[in-house]
């Protein structure tokens, strides 16, 4: 490879492409848009779900279920991850989980699940515990403290209604 083989590729100050200025310009007459059709017209933009006039997928596939706006969002964490992230005798709180990037995003309640091994004595504060998680925590000598819900269902409904 020689120095004269190297090229800059995309030029920084490429001149604007002038279209529709006669056949000698190379982009005259149809201005690079082909002949007729929707895509040749000005102002046309196809809908993102347009499938060439065929029955679109979102109308072919049956709809199922609904989104329950009153449902709780529950964040689950396993005792195995807590065992890896925390030291012996530490207290596992929502703030501590967020500081160690174990609890992310917005959620209403925290649930501790029993997947993995727990060998350290931990005090774990959460809204819910699975049976296996409670058994593993007590077997390791730790305690499972249940937190009160952030908001009651009635309070959540009132908060969502007031957002409107």
Swiss-Prot record:
Biased segments, Basic and acidic residues type: 147-164
Keywords: Ribonucleoprotein, Ribosomal protein, RNA-binding, rRNA-binding
InterPro entries hit by this protein: Ribosomal_uL15 (IPR030878), Ribosomal_uL15/eL18 (IPR021131), Ribosomal_uL15/eL18_sf (IPR036227), Ribosomal_uL15_bac-type (IPR005749), Ribosomal_uL15_CS (IPR001196)
Annotated spans, Disordered: 1-57, 132-164
Record bears the keyword Ribosomal protein: yes
Gly residues: compositionally biased ranges: 21-31
Record-level GO BP terms: translation
Amino acid composition bias (Basic residues), ranges on this chain: 9-20, 32-41
Family affiliation: Belongs to the universal ribosomal protein uL15 family.
Record's function text: Binds to the 23S rRNA.
Assembly: Part of the 50S ribosomal subunit.
Name of the molecule in the record: Large ribosomal subunit protein uL15
Protein's organism: Rhodopirellula baltica (strain DSM 10527 / NCIMB 13988 / SH1)
